[in-house]
Swiss-Prot record:
GO CC field: nucleoplasm; U12-type spliceosomal complex
Coiled-coil features, chain-numbered ranges: 232-335, 362-411
Cellular localization per UniProt: Nucleus
GO biological process: apoptotic process; response to glucocorticoid; RNA splicing
Keyword presence, Cell membrane: no
Name of the coding gene: PDCD7
UniProt name for this protein: Programmed cell death protein 7
Region span, Disordered: 1-133
Subunit record text: Interacts with RBM40. Component of the U11/U12 snRNPs that are part of the U12-type spliceosome.
Keyword Coiled coil: yes
């Protein structure tokens, strides 16, 4: 059974276009109609939920022949209404590309042609205003137009890539050409010598000449580009560029090496500073430990004296307690009516005085012994401090002498490298004569005193306290003549 025509005479037309469905949660709203976003095509309503599927016809081979009446719109069985299939609908609005993407990827409207009778071709819409596109999209569009105006239109996919012109001979090519020419010259030189020797033998001479001719032709071919000024100039420019690049690389390598050496020197200086700090900390700890040991030794030596002093104090307390006890017993006996004789009191008092004198002598002896021990320990501690101070001063003096020797070696050269008979020895003796002769010192000071000026003089300065070191070399030529340490 044939299907009835889609639109008959009494059948209503397609429904009006419905507004697009609301965007899902979190998606931007669909854009308004514009050249970049044409309105969606109307679709045939179907039983499918949501957007309906487009109306598709069966293939032409499966369609029955339609009569003229049916073609003119009449109804009847076994005929189709000759309606062309509508184009495929565009993707959903939320999946459309942004209006700032590449023009090659931007969807274009369908080509002009007969559309469905119920869907006339949409009119050309004007460009969307700024408030429709948004500030970000409008700025993006302006940036793209500016880039195209400055740098030209970007090359589309499939466009032929312009071929780069030959930039000139490479150094490898020139080197290979020169090496081949040098080999040919060597062979021709050998053949020339052989030709001179084979002048008497005509056949051998002809054979050698036949070998020489192609070599000469090849040599002329090899040397022909070298006669062109442009070829030679380009080769020289490339060679100069390579030379400058190598110089830059060497300079950078030299700078990196100097940086590494400076970093190594800084690391050595830091290590030396750390070592000095550690030595100082160790010395402080050792000094404190030594003081504690001396104090412990002094306490050990003085412990016996202090013990004896404690015994004398205890004996004094015992005598005081005995005197108090006798007084209490005497009072108790007096209450009972018993009175001791006066001789007993005298004897008791005599013994107490004798014991107090003995304890006093012992106490004075122990105090003198303690003072002697303290003086002895303080003397030992003072000697130890003097030895430490002398050792420190000796180290400082050695350090100063080493620095002085280093400065003198920079000024006058290393004495190990320059013996006494060297040409610079008189100058060394002249500049160091004040260290060995008092008249020379007085004369030098007198010469310096001639330049004394008041302290408020604008050009006055102090006499240098040490050697005036020379400045660094001002150029490379002078640096080659100076040995830097």
């Amino acid at each position: 059974m044939a299907l009835p025509p889609f639109f008959g005479q009494g059948r209503p037309g397609p429904p009006p276009p419905q507004p697009p469905p609301p965007a899902p949660f979190g998606c931007p709203p669909p854009p308004l109609p514009s050249p970049a976003f044409p309105p969606p095509l109307p679709q045939r309503p179907g039983p499918f939920p949501g957007a309906s599927a487009p109306f598709l016809q069966p293939p032409l081979a499966l369609q029955p022949r339609a009569s003229a009446e049916a073609s003119r719109g009449g109804g009847g069985a076994g005929a189709f209404y000759p309606v062309p299939p509508p184009p495929l609908p565009p993707p959903p609005p939320q999946c459309r590309p942004f209006p700032g993407t590449d023009a090659g990827e931007r969807p274009r409207p369908p080509p002009p042609g007969p559309g469905p009778p119920w869907s006339p071709r949409w009119p050309e819409a004007p460009p969307p205003p700024a408030d429709v596109l948004g500030d970000a999209a409008l700025q993006r569009l302006r940036d793209r137009q500016w880039l195209e105006a400055v740098f030209g239109t970007p090359r589309r996919a499939g466009c032929p890539v312009p071929q780069r012109t030959h930039a000139g001979p490479s150094l490898g090519e020139v080197r290979a050409r020169l090496l081949r020419a040098l080999r040919l010259v060597r062979r021709l030189r050998g053949l020339s010598q052989a030709l001179r020797e084979a002048e008497a033998d005509g056949a051998a001479w002809v054979l050698l000449y036949s070998q020489t001719a192609p070599l000469r032709a090849e040599l002329a071919e090899r040397l022909q580009p070298l006669t062109q000024a442009a070829y030679v100039g380009e080769a020289r420019r490339r060679l100069e560029r390579v030379r400058r690049r190598r110089l830059r690389l060497r300079e950078r390598a030299r700078e990196r090496e100097a940086e590494r050496e400076a970093e190594a020197a800084r690391a050595v200086e830091r290590e030396q500073e750390i070592d000095r700090w550690r030595v100082k900390c160790v010395q402080e700890v050792e000094e404190k430990k030594r003081e504690q040991e001396l104090k412990a030794a002094a306490d050990g030596v003085l412990s016996e004296v202090r013990k004896k002093q404690a015994d004398t104090k205890r004996m004094v307390d015992i005598l005081r307690a005995l005197e108090k006890l006798r007084k209490l017993r005497k009072e108790a006996a007096a209450r009972k009516g018993v009175c001791p004789p006066a001789s007993a009191d005298e004897t008791f008092t005599h013994h107490l005085q004798r014991l107090r004198k003995l304890i006093k002598k012992r106490s004075e002896l122990y105090e003198a012994e303690e003072r002697a021990l303290r003086v002895m320990l303080e003397g030992e501690q003072e000697e130890e401090r003097k030895r430490e101070l002398e050792k420190k001063q000796r180290k400082e003096k050695e350090k100063i002498l080493l620095q002085k020797r280093e400065i003198e070696s920079k000024l006058f050269g290393d004495p190990d490298e320059f013996p006494l008979a060297h040409l610079l020895e008189p100058f060394r003796q002249y500049y160091l004569q004040a260290e060995h002769s008092l008249p020379a010192l007085i004369q030098i000071r007198h010469d310096w005193d001639q330049y004394l000026v008041p302290s408020d003089h604008p050009k006055g300065n102090f006499v240098p306290q040490g050697w005036v070191l020379p400045p660094l070399p001002s150029n490379d030529i002078w640096a080659t003549a100076v040995k830097l340490h």
